[in-house]
């Protein structure tokens, strides 16, 4: 869900961004490659390797933030929901010394389990892209978690089924890493509150 820079209130915001800004946090949202409306090459660079090029772009944004005199580079966090939750955990486990805290809501963990209409559209099938599915699975990254990670999951989520989070938690326990896990019984993927 790409964002745009404009000089008006974002009415589609969940309120999280406003809340964090009111608490004194600097929010930075970057449209990485894979976002739409920038041409075919920009959008399709992520094909068969979701999250990989996007992380590179996000880290360019981090470099920019670190160059600002009013940004404390030792206190960076990351937040996202759904694919953004996937990116949150990806960034925290692939760049464990950069992000101190993360909040991942309804995160995709392994594209094998995600709905076919999206997963296979961007990743191809597991049979034709086994390397891509393995490389992008966060199950193999659980051992790299260092910062504080909060995972939020609605138990009635039919978009990113709870199997994603539960399997990641199992991998974290086996690796000796410990994210916080908040379960919301009866809640769907796009919960409020």
Enumerate the language-model features and the residues they cover:
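Serine-hydrolase catalytic core recognition
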Residues: 1-193
